[in-house]
Structure formats: C-alpha cells, structure tokens
Amino acid sequence: MTVYEGLKNKYPESDIVYTDGYDLATNELHLMDARNAAMQSDVVIVAVGERFENSGEAKSRADINIHPNHQLLVKELKKTGKNVVVLLMGGRPMIFNEMTPHADAILLTWWLGTEAGNAIADVLAGDYNPSGKLPMTFPAHVGQLPIYYNYKNTGRPETKEIGYSCRYQDIDFEPAY
C-alpha cells in the first residue's frame, strides 16, 4: 500500500495529485511536474529518503545525508508558497538539516510494512499521534559519526560452530570444558 493509495483511501472525495517528483537521477521534467502539481494543491506531501535496499545488514554508508536531489525537490516545492509535509523514509538515521528550513512538518516513517500507506494517512489526518522517542540518535553532521579503521566488516558469512545444525537431531554433545 503506497502513501498515495493510503491517502486516496482516507480521502476518497478529494482530488489527490501524484507525480514522480525528483528521483536520485537528475530529471528536470520530473522537477517541473512536481512544481506544477504543487501550485495546484492546497498542501504538498513529499516522500524522500533512501531506497529500502540501501539499509539493513551490511549496508553501511559513510555519508548518510539525504540525497541532494531530494533536498532540491523539497526546496523547490517550498518556493511555491504551499505548506510542505516531508515524509522521511529510511531504515537508519539520516542527516536532513539542509531540508528542515523548507519543510513545515517532517514525519519519520521508517520502512513500514504492507499497510504503510494507510498508517501514514492516519497520522497525516490526525487520527493517530506519532508520539514517542526516537530509537536512535540522529546526527546533525556526518563528522559526528564514528568511523572505525581495521574492524571486521559486516556482511561476512557466519562461522558455523562445531556441532551446529539446522535440523533436529538426537545427538549428545559433550561439554567443551
């Protein structure tokens, strides 16, 4: 369920306009379409962040800034004079300081499940209050992130211990001590 589908479900009588916006590849036509759609709207809801395949195990990055094209998109949409609500999607803390002054509201959505669109629409409609504490710290700058040298990389195959098995067995193991 996409955010667009969730909003259509929540507001079936409303005219909700969707455009591709501005993806990670530079495409001025998409940016122009997003600007034109924003000019015809009462409020702008823009989803930015990272792709779902870029977060998770063995997906470490040295630069966790929001992609410059996404920052530009939010900045350009704010120039329309409309209220801009940013949906920040990702699976890790990200740096979005440059985007913050151009957003009237930012909702951190993480990567939700199959009902993400309905859940996000419920929050945007005020039917649910997204209260609570962040489960991790969001740095203000990349320089605040610890960078380790000469540590074992993530994503290596796990080492199987002696006696390890992926099935049930009737084998007695002697203690190692």
Task: Put a short name on every predicted segment.
Residues M1-A37:
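Functional beta-strand-loop-alpha-helix junction segments that form "active/interaction loops"
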Residues K8, V74-G81:
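Surface-exposed amphipathic alpha-helices with a cationic face
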Residues M1-Y4, K8-Y11, M89-Y177:
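Secreted, periplasmic, or luminal enzymes acting at the cell surface/secretory milieu
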Residues N69-V74, V84-V86, I106, I120:
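Extended, hydrophobic alpha-helical segments in both membrane/secreted and soluble proteins
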Residues S41:
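An anion/phosphate-binding loop that grips the pyrophosphate of nucleotide cofactors and donors
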Residues V48-P68:
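Glycine/threonine-rich flexible loop motifs
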Residues E13-S14, T80-V84, A103:
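A short helix->loop->beta-strand "cap" motif at the edges of active sites that frequently abuts
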